[in-house]
Amino acid sequence: MKEFELKYGCNPNQKPAKIYMNDGSELPIQILSGRPGYINFLDAFNSWQLVKELKEALGLPAVTSFKHVSPTSAAVGIPLSDDLKKACFVDDIEGLDDSPLACAYARARGTDRMCSFGDWVAMSDVCDVTTAKMLKREVSDGVIAPGYEPEALEILKTKRKGNYNIVQIDPDYVPEAQERKQVFGITFEQGRNNFEINRALLSEIVTKNKDLPDSAARDLIIALITLKYTQSNSVCYAVDGQAIGVGAGQQSRIHCTRLAGSKADTWFLRQHEKVLNLPFRADLGRPERDNVIDGYINQNEEDVCADGNWQKYFETQPAPLTDAEKKAFLSTRQNVALGSDAFFPFSDNIERAYRSGVKYIAEPGGSIRDDAVIDCCNRYGMVMAFDGLRLFHH
């Protein structure tokens, strides 16, 4: 297949639309089901690069959940705790611990379930049956992987009345060294961002505390590779083999740090005993439960515990999660990693990161206020590496 005609471009009025190879060669993909759209393919090709690089960097199966050309999370295949399984709605999945790919999917899809509603999924490895069973029951636009087990493919083909978008990519495909795009009829050309992110990038530790364990280095690598494919400005919190908060597309660095931090806090609080034991009505679907949990934790527009409201969601009226309970639970967090796609211009980013349990940081350095940022890290006993690598993505 040398080109694929799309229903439309970014918006329904943008026609005609298609994808094709500039040199007239075959596309490196097969479409096994559905008819992916313009934004679907933007998500697919960005997300595939992310998981491919994670697998190469860490040697573990990797999965990411994408929405509007940015990841909601990315994760590698590490088994989940019982509480995390419950928080991710996968505690009923048989054989989960036996499939590293399924563990990576459970983590990535379960991190920011509100934002992953209608996501695009990328997998570094051949999709197995366990992973397909989990993906089948989530609201998703499509998936890209280097292959699919026959039974897994048949499971996925039943989604969306047989119209679920399933793309298979050639894992050996390597794009040209130069990439191009047009804006307002003007062609932009640049070299692809081929810089390899690995442990060596974290060798310049500028803080007094220089103890960077392997687990922290892994999480920093996950954060940085995630940022490489996130719309800038961006900041990413990561822990235990997964990104837990992505702050994407903000014009201010501190707003990135706050947004990602609030997402990380929500992820932690989903594992609070009160949240895990909310008495949901049996007829309440998974997306509705996600909305209610978010409201319960963050006290959004609707008080889900109030008289006249709780009856819509719960069998019995739950006690609210108080500010004191949230503060106490969040105070137990530790060893969180944080990556930034550009330098921190002020130490307020460090102050906010500390509130979400951050101990390890990787950022390029180069600010005129680097000394103030380093001093703030030292006050909290943090470990910070200057990686010297800006990771803007547009």
Where are these regions (language model features)?
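Active-site-proximal loop/turn and secondary-structure-junction residues that shape catalytic pockets
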Residues: S70, C127, V239-D240, F344, ...
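C-terminal binding/interaction regions
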Residues: D119, M123-S124, R137-V167, D172-V174, ...
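Active-site loops and adjacent core secondary-structure elements that bind or stabilize anionic groups
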Residues: M1-L201, A216-S234
